[in-house]
């Protein structure tokens, strides 16, 4: 969640855009279009990069070696593409900042903040990509006593979908 601080930069009254992608958790290790972005260099500050404090450009394929699944990495690449190609954010002012277990919400398995460097505030969170697992739907199922299972027609299995959430301050 984006919290209000830094005076006018972050106010309580602003628009937050969210996109939630529901998917079969058994398919998170793959994405049908991953090959189209596998050589894309992503500007990341992984947990292990923090001591150096330097953004490292890694290809999407290289990021799979850090344990991140292709489905998640694909969406990181598409977010970065949007910020570079549509919004024209300068490359050197952009990074994905990986949150560690004590920084991220307990229900997020993977969590990267999208940060943009602002002249007066340094790198500042502007959005994020959160893998929320099945936390939301299992909670709703428990409270409502309604099954949240769906049939994945491609595999024939019943699953509770997992959620990948993209959120951005507008």
Language model: regions and residue ranges:
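TRNA-recognition modules of translation machinery and tRNA-sensing kinases, especially anticodon-binding
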Residues: 1-170
